[in-house]
């Protein structure tokens, strides 16, 4: 399932982080087992991230443990409406010592369209995937556009992009370009006011 591959690779904030050692693993489901690896600045906090991609009655969750920067840890959570009743959601929990506690996924609110829309897309192996209209709901009045890549030993650089409606703009910094293995890098982070449908 392409969406499953996307969510496993999507988490654009996962990065290796000083001399602290943290668990490193990825898996489908609620937990994973991997190995300890040393962090390097500025990603010097241990953390656990849950990602969920949901579309209608189908939802898939993945877990990611790694070293994170303080800016990512402060993000705590995000919910992006990518259109077609589909969401990408994340819950981030960082801690001084392993194991980090979990954050729960509350159910999505039954929100109604609010008269705004954004370009929506979720792409893997491309930085410019086909856009469609994401109808914003509830408190979603911002458009998010994130582009990045992750370098793996095989198949190499994996580009990805994410666009959709969001309730507030996250404070994220661009990453320095590099080809270090098992790292994610942000190349573009744009957040602006959502577009408003013309009143009939």
Curated annotation (Swiss-Prot):
SMART domains: LU. The keyword RNA-binding does not apply. The keyword ATP-binding does not apply. N-glycosylated. Expressed by the liver. Keywords: Disulfide bond, Glycoprotein, Phospholipase A2 inhibitor, Secreted, Signal. Disulfide bonds join 22-46, 25-32, 39-67, 73-94, 95-100, 118-143, 136-165, 169-191. One of its GO terms (cellular component) is extracellular region. One of its GO terms (molecular function) is phospholipase A2 inhibitor activity. It is found in: Secreted. Its main location: secreted. InterPro entries: CNF-like_PLA2_Inhibitor, LY6_UPA_recep-like, PLipase_A2-inh_b-type, PLipase_A2_inh_N, Snake_toxin-like_sf. Glycans are attached at residue 176. Residues 1-19 form the signal peptide. It holds the Pfam family PLA2_inh. It comes from the Eukaryota. Belongs to the CNF-like-inhibitor family. PANTHER family: LY6/PLAUR DOMAIN-CONTAINING PROTEIN 8 (PTHR20914), LY6_PLAUR DOMAIN CONTAINING 9 (PTHR20914:SF30). Inhibits basic phospholipase A2 isozymes PLA-B, BP-I and BP-II. Occurs as a mixture of oligomers. Tetrameric arrangement appears to be the predominant quaternary structure. This is Phospholipase A2 inhibitor 1.
């Amino acid at each position: 399932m392409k969406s499953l591959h996307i969510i496993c690779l999507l988490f654009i904030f996962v990065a290796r982080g000083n001399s602290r050692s943290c668990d490193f693993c990825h898996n489908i489901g609620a937990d994973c087992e991997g190995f300890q690896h040393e962090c390097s600045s500025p990603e010097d906090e241990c953390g656990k991230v849950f990602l969920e991609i949901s579309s209608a009655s189908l939802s898939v969750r993945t877990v990611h443990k790694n070293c994170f920067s303080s800016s990512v840890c402060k993000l705590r959570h995000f919910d992006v409406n990518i259109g077609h009743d589909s969401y990408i959601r994340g819950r981030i929990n960082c801690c001084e010592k392993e194991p980090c506690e979990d954050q729960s996924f509350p159910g999505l609110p039954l929100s109604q369209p609010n008269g705004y829309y954004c370009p929506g897309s979720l792409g893997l192996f491309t930085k410019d995937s086909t856009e469609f209209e994401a109808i914003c709901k509830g408190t979603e009045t911002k458009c998010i556009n994130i582009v990045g890549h992750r370098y793996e030993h095989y198949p190499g650089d994996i580009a990805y992009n994410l666009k959709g409606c969001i309730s507030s703009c996250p404070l994220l910094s661009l990453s320095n370009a590099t080809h270090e293995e098992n790292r994610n890098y942000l190349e573009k982070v744009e957040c602006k006011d959502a577009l408003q449908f013309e009143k009939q």
